[in-house]
């Protein structure tokens, strides 16, 4: 490692040049990486709802649709608007009454099913827009944006495709502010905690490289989710800031011991790499545990963040030293007093009251651990969006005027007879919460020659060997009521056609709930096991990994239990990923604390003295790192209009503070009290002479 460090210091100008040049392909890769705004596409492809979604898309071209509620618009204007919409690139068809019969025929003369389906309250009628591509495709997004401009007054545009386009527009609008807020808040903490005014700017400049490289290399993944895109910069900034702080502190210590700055930096690089190798590996392992999720959104977040941490480590020991040495004179020239102190008084208090602190903590932990299991989550991510968005307003309007709170798409094989389909529709109509059931056979009636219907109608109701049945529900997606409804409907369908499936937002969300519940358990287990293994190998200990992981898991339990007491519902994805993120991001603090405690014991200090010295000397680094992580994420939580991102960032920021408090107050006390157990379960913890000396003292 020393030869590598010498090469880094010697070739620092070349390194900076190459690092800057690499920003160019990174920018190209970042721009070319597609962003996916549809969370439901991350469901396992073998689920019935996803199989049905493929059939809807490939055979019926209905996987991406939009519904327009039109109130009080004269027929001639409505038909003119229909033609304008059909002219938009990316639109396959705009379906309305005029595609079936002459719109001048009085509505009273129409079949009851058509009346109920096409006409609603408030003198409203409905148009269905079919798009060429999937809901989250760029073509569909562009088409939705164009249609919004074409719509007349008192037209309400709803459906999945519209909401996804709204999400994209909102993210693109807010993303620059997320980054500015995270960087600005982090700089404030760094200016207050670091002596040099220039150092925080160097840190941010140094983090620009791994963040840019991370986004640029996402091109090899093909696409990333909008959640990953929104969180990656903030998380990478907060998580990898530790490494920069550790390098700086090591460099400052080595400058006092070495004859010149270059020798000091070589030594600092070697010692930093040694100290951050375990912590970075645990962080990477924590994020990679998300890959155990069947919901592949976890793999998306996990790979991007693990890659970001790895790039952060490389840039910390390669690019940042070159920056610090280049601007070393300016760093020394512009200095000020720091605000964040060493916690000397607290260190004596903790070491003097270790048993009391641990006992109180364990008692306080119990209600939070119980509350964590009872915290409510929601799965309808559209509820996390501002309710004044075009797609949300339009979708709510469909529920008000047509009773289409949720629409189920049922696919059965076309070899079922008209009477079988009709009987099935009657059964489905009897299910609680179903407001209407529409199929080709229920509209035409028995004996009707379907060849008389226009192709545009047939394509919607029968295609690719399947018949489509549309069932509208008054129940909201993601609720127990609609999940029970779907189970009852599925029983009816399987009795007639064992290969029949239900798809649509309601069915996919039900599958999402079932998958997420399993994922939650898997992710927690894998992340804990991975971190335990790495800490075990690093410290060659059985007890230390359990102690450190237990400390962070206790902090996570407190963090996840608080929403129960405040009556706050969490988005399901937050409940799955927050434990892994908090464990991976803050286990560094516990490793730093334990490493220092080991050093103090090796110097011959008693457990009490070692705990006091450890807390005093580690407090500034942990406070700086923890407060920076808190500032970066709480700023985003404060400004985001998306409740999903707001909730995740708030949990992360609060988790950083709780983990920081537990590591600073509880862990030193726990290390001190379990010192005997640690010695018996750790290889080469203390040499015999040191142990005897300590025990005599």
PLM features per residue range, with description:
Residues 44-161, 376-378, 382-544, 550-569:
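Structured non-transmembrane domains adjacent to transmembrane bundles in polytopic membrane proteins
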